[in-house]
Amino acid sequence: LTVTDAASGRVMAGKTVSLHKGNNKISLPFIIRNPRLWWSNGLGEQHLYDFRTALTINNETSDIQSTKVGIRSLKIINRPDKDGKTFYVELNGVPVFAKGANYIPQDNFLPRVTPELYEKTILDAANVNMNMLRIWGGGIYENDLFYELCDRYGILVWQDFMFACSLYPAEGELLENIRQEAIDNVKRLRNHACIALWCGNNECNDAWFNWGWQKRYKAQNPEYEKKIWKQFTDQYYVTLPEVVKEYAPESFYWPSSPFAREDGGSDDHNGDRHYWDVWHGKKPIETYNKERSRFFSEYGFQSFPEFESVKRYAPCEEDWDIYSEVMMSHQRGGMHANQLIETYLLNEYRKPKNFEAFLYMNHVLQGDAIKTAIEAHRRDMPYCMGTLFWQHNDCWPVASWASRDYYGRWKAQHYFARKAYRDILVSPITDEGEVLNIQVVSDRLKSCNGTLQVEVMKLTGEKVNSYKRNIKIDANSSQTVFSVPLGEALKNTPKEDVFVHAVLL
């Protein structure tokens, strides 16, 4: 049995083995001195070693397997600090701010997803400076190609086990089926450099404690409530973590998303958070600027596909109304969601003159909302160390929270995300004390210098005020590099008549 580096032809390890009937577990340890490391998108190269493992019997090759492996150290740092507990990825000893989105299956009919579509989907993440996708627990364990592409393009994967928004009778044969399914997938995926963590489920813990499920079952039958909770803990606190510990012992297991504490409480100081007060909760978009979490693993804002995509399922002009039967049939959130889009849009902009203009302004609205959230989360670094919006893609032509529609067309949000996810972000913000602050966030691993230019402009294009400063940008940091009282910056010009343009020259 030999292991060979395909690039150099060097035999890394080999030994003579005796095989018995059935499974044979054989270890072939070897050392790679000064290895080329695998980095996530934006931090370095995604070097993959190609190892060929060959079994030779009587001087003939009986079997050969090729495995591409990225060498990296990866930890989820979840330890106490003065505010609660940290929650972030440490890659090759470096804290990494996770920038990305949630991923769902690409089609309701999975055989229609071609290798070309897989590559476009992952490239569309990498090309807007994402470094993480969360595979949502209501979808599927993706095929090998998906993870190979994430390895190739430096996209870390938050991997949910496939359980979502439900309770499962996890005992007996079903619990054993759950265990075997988990074993199959952990073994299949454990050698991929992209795998960042394993998560037990999507929102099941939150549903039990915060959606009223526990109270309802307890009121109906306290003994039944105890039985359900026993099954729940057997599934997410015993079976799944045991599988990860046995088959991928260096991987991190997280019981649920969102999750803060085992008693079901959710707070801003621990774990990850799904934040939906903007959108479902109808709060203003600027509320994003005030919310905190260690890691935002879900939040979102809806839009329709762009007009050319809509015309593929609503080709007739009489259907060009968001409340038409056709458009309502392609709305993931029903009447409620259309009303939310309309309310938010009219709060921010004038009424669009026609259907096409409405779709366009809806795209701008969605993009501005998610940009506001991303910038707020990045400014809060290192307290907050992750932002994954809902969602990266769609599985059918529909109005949804996706930044790319079913046909792969980028919505405005995807372009907004590309800018908000750049390695150096310049983000103006006013605080409650009526001070204009300019924050610069850098994901770079080395400090650098730059010239900051800040211009206060009227909407007519007339310049009200301008500033220019030479600044030092610290590595892997968020810092306020310029502040000025708002009154001084505006020179008595009403706030509603101006905008701030800040740029690094």
Question: Where does each model-flagged region fall?
Answer:
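Active-site-adjacent substrate/metal-binding segments within catalytic domains
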Residues: 35-38, 52, 59-166, 172-197, ...
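Active-site proximal loops enriched in glycine and acidic residues that flank catalytic Cys/His/Asp
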Residues: 100, 137, 159-161, 199-202, ...
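Secreted/periplasmic carbohydrate-active enzymes, especially glycoside hydrolases
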Residues: 1-132, 379-380, 384, 409, ...
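A general structural detector for well-ordered alpha-helical segments in enzyme core domains, enriched
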Residues: 121, 146, 174, 178-181, ...
